[in-house]
Amino acid sequence: MVNVVLAGGGTAGHTSPLIATAMGLKEHGATVSCVGTPKGLEGRVIPEAGLELDMIPPVPLPRTVNADLFKVPARLTGAVRKAGEVLKRRQADVVVGFGGYVSLPAYLAAKRAKIPVVIHEQNAVPGLANKIAARFAVFVGTAFPDTPLPKAQFVGMP
């Protein structure tokens, strides 16, 4: 049986396809758990869907130069460490990410642990976490055929 950790959150745009994918994976016998942050919608909707949810600290990535930008390295380091603990405890065989604050730490923790990363990008214009991780992901699926990501393959929306 394969252990899949799904990462995504913040908005319904990330959590809805995550939940749909989780249900499909469970129907095929996978053990599924999710990782999110306390800031996003996932804290409510993922448990309501009957899925297990582990929390890690959010790492907002400021789009302008301000004081918060200088806090990112320490925040990211801590979040990657926490995500790594989750992946180890869940004995993850693969990490599937959908974007949002939680995804980048999960992707980096998976890369560090040599766990394959799979990405689903729901937007025509990809988010920052998915742009970064697409370079080392084993598969990148998109909801739109022309989404500009390395290795992108159009798969539609789950």
Predicted regions and their residues:
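Residue-level detector of alpha-helix initiation sites
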Residues: 11-12, 16, 100-102, 124-128
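Active-site-proximal region of nucleotide-activated glycan assembly enzymes
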Residues: 31, 41, 52, 111-158
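Short, glycine-rich nucleotide/cofactor-binding loops
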Residues: 6-14, 94-95
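Residue-level signature of catalytic and energy-coupling elements of molecular machines
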Residues: 13, 46, 99, 140
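Short amphipathic alpha-helix
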Residues: 14-25
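Glycosyltransferases and closely related glycan-assembly transferases
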Residues: 82-95, 102-118, 131-136
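Hydrophobic alpha-helical packing residues
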Residues: 25-26, 110
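Conserved nucleotide-sugar phosphate-binding/catalytic loop shared by glycosyltransferases and other
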Residues: 3-9, 28-78, 84, 155
